[in-house]
């Protein structure tokens, strides 16, 4: 028997996943296009936290959006980083006047999108900082700079979110 997939059409899977996420957790988050937004963001009087990445491993980063965790995630297509403009839009949306921390996984596409977004954010006058994960020791084919930093991202999300909620400054977070 041939294995079936829970996919209606490959070209709409990301949009459908995000709609489903919004329907499953309406009390925690909202979905606006390819942005997953914490319901807690509206009242945020603190440093806010944004991350981004390709879809395909849901709930992945989007599953960490919500009260006490991430504020916004920009979602790319399957295994592809979102473009820099979408990441910038996420930072702009998240900015509540105390600064925005952009958490980046160490993948080439994510690095490129983050660099573009940071350039746009600085040009717009946003107070932003970027942290790139890179702790992974299992996967290191070309040297230390290529460590993906996937596993440590979850701990980083928790630590940064806790510091932000304690009222720490952007540099402290």
Please provide the spans of the model-predicted regions.
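Gly-rich Lys/Arg/Thr-decorated short loops/hinges at beta-loop-alpha junctions or inter-strand turns
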Residues: 2, 44-52, 61-74, 137-141
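A structural-propensity feature for long, helix-poor, extended segments
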Residues: 88-106, 112, 145-158
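Short glycine/serine/threonine-rich phosphate/pyrophosphate-binding segments
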Residues: 58-61, 85-88, 109-115, 138-141
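Short glycine-rich or small-residue beta-strand-to-loop segments that form or flank ligand, phosphate
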Residues: 4, 47-54, 70-73, 99-108, ...
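N-terminal amphipathic/basic leader segments beginning at the initiator methionine
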Residues: 1-49
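Alpha-helix capping and helix-loop boundary segments enriched in small/acidic/polar residues
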Residues: 5-8, 56, 75-82, 105-109, ...
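Short alpha-helices
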Residues: 131-171
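Glycine-rich oxoanion-binding loops at beta->alpha junctions
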Residues: 57, 64-97
């Amino acid at each position: 028997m041939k294995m079936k997939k829970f996919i209606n059409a490959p070209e709409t899977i990301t949009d459908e996943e995000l709609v489903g996420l919004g329907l499953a957790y309406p009390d925690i988050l909202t979905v606006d296009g390819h942005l997953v937004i914490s319901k807690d963001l509206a009242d945020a009087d603190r440093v806010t936290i944004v991350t981004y990445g390709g879809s395909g491993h849901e709930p992945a980063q989007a599953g960490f959006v919500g009260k006490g965790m991430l504020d916004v995630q920009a979602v790319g297509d399957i295994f592809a980083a979102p473009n820099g403009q979408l990441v910038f839009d996420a930072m702009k949306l998240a900015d509540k006047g105390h600064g925005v921390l952009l958490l980046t996984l160490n993948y080439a596409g994510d690095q490129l999108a983050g660099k573009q977004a940071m350039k746009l954010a600085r040009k717009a006058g946003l107070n932003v900082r970027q942290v790139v994960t890179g702790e992974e020791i299992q996967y290191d084919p070309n040297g230390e700079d290529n460590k993906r930093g996937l596993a440590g991202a979850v701990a980083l999300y928790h630590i940064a979110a806790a510091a932000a909620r304690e009222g720490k400054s952007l540099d402290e977070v």
